């Protein structure tokens, strides 16, 4: 559980994905034992075991119900206090399987470009795997003779989704179930901004003259594998706070800055945004369409990229044309041009681009 006594501005929270996994695990355990527990230990995607409080536990024949309330810590977004609810049904016709569906308040994917099945629930891949793993852990030997259908719902999800960009992304009818680690760090707090600056300062004292800035845990793991010669303190998770990280790099006198990221955040940087939080700025798909046009993509492809709301869609369209590497390299070059204009003659810049599985797809220069 979270430390309620942590200093203000530093308390971490849990993602909608982690809370969904905890609710699903509790409900599954209810089917195994006949009673849903009021506390459940849940394995997070980052490997941590965390205990969650469980509410509304009930078992009715082959179906069990459980709910976990999201606590976002000191980074409360519009899904803070959401009731992540799991209804788990024993499926004797599906031995060994875990079937995941979305109920009321969980959005439905209606457009490509998100890495999710069109027509399916907006439950991202990492939470999907995490929910499945926790159900399997709770089910134990019962999986040998039956499967489990897990329906995740969020009673306040429709209302909460109005405060997100989901509708513009083609996710309709509710929120998305998100989270790559299970933990919500206080990215929007002054304390986290201070930790970014401090991290860059530490990198400056190492004597290597380089700092590697990443937008999150997956991209940090990716660039660490690409640059194994650097010590761990040279890598700083800047989150959405590019502005603070770059200013700290200038002040520290660092001679090289490496930025590792995925296409969405890098597009925002290329378009001149220095705070890249989803709520602060939208992806300029016109910029991506222009890059595609410069590489010879057909006008109808460029227009489709321009009209779509995600950078991922642009990358997938260009991949399909065999121009994915060239497209992502051009985007990385645009990031360098934008930052060199903002910080002229301050440091050498390198940009590494990874896909959503943490694999390298491009770099510049």
Curated annotation (Swiss-Prot):
Name assigned to this protein: Cobalt-precorrin-5B C(1)-methyltransferase
Keywords associated with the record: Cobalamin biosynthesis, Methyltransferase, S-adenosyl-L-methionine, Transferase
Reaction(s) the record says it catalyses: Co-precorrin-5B + S-adenosyl-L-methionine = Co-precorrin-6A + S-adenosyl-L-homocysteine
Keyword Nucleotide-binding: no
EC top class named in words: transferase
Lineage: Bacteria, Pseudomonadati, Pseudomonadota, Betaproteobacteria, Burkholderiales
Residue stretches in coiled coil: none
EC number assigned by the record: 2.1.1.195
Family of this protein: Belongs to the CbiD family.
Gene Ontology biological process terms from the UniProt entry: anaerobic cobalamin biosynthetic process; methylation
Top-rank lineage group of the source organism: Bacteria
Pathway given in the UniProt record: Cofactor biosynthesis; adenosylcobalamin biosynthesis; cob(II)yrinate a,c-diamide from sirohydrochlorin (anaerobic route): step 6/10
Pfam families: CbiD (PF01888)
Species this protein is from: Polaromonas naphthalenivorans (strain CJ2)
């Amino acid at each position: 559980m979270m430390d309620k006594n942590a200093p203000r501005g530093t308390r971490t929270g849990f993602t909608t994905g982690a809370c969904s996994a905890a609710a699903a695990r509790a409900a599954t355990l209810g089917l195994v034992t006949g009673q849903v527990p009021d506390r459940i230990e849940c394995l997070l995607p980052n490997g941590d075991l965390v205990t969650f409080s469980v509410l509304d536990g009930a078992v009715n024949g082959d179906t069990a119900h459980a709910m976990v309330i999201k606590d976002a810590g000191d980074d409360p977004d519009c899904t803070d206090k959401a009731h992540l609810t799991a209804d788990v049904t024993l499926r004797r016709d599906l031995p060994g399987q875990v079937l995941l569906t979305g109920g009321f308040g969980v959005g439905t994917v209606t457009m490509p470009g998100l890495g999710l099945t069109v027509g399916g629930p907006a439950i991202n891949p990492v939470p999907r795997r995490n929910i499945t793993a926790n159900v399997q852990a709770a089910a134990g030997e019962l999986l040998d003779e039956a499967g489990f259908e897990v329906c995740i719902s969020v009673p306040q999800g429709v209302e909460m989704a109005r405060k997100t960009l989901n509708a513009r992304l083609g996710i309709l009818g509710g929120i998305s179930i998100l989270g790559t680690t299970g933990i919500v760090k206080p990215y929007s707090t002054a304390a986290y901004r201070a930790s970014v600056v401090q991290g860059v300062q530490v990198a400056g004292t190492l004597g290597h003259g380089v700092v590697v800035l990443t937008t999150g845990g997956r991209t940090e793991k990716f660039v660490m594998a690409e640059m194994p010669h650097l010590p761990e303190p040279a890598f700083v998770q800047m989150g959405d706070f590019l502005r603070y990280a770059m200013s700290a790099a200038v002040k520290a006198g660092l001679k090289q800055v490496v930025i590792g990221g995925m296409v969405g955040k890098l597009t925002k940087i290329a378009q001149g945004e220095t705070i890249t939080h989803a709520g602060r700025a939208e992806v300029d798909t016109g910029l991506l369409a222009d890059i595609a046009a410069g590489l010879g993509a057909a006008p109808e492809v460029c227009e489709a990229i321009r009209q779509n709301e995600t950078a991922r869609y642009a990358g997938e369209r260009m991949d399909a044309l065999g121009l994915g590497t060239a497209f992502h390299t051009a985007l990385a070059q645009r990031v360098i041009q934008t930052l060199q204009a903002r910080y002229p003659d301050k440091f050498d810049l390198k940009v590494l681009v990874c896909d959503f599985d943490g694999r390298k797809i491009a770099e510049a220069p």
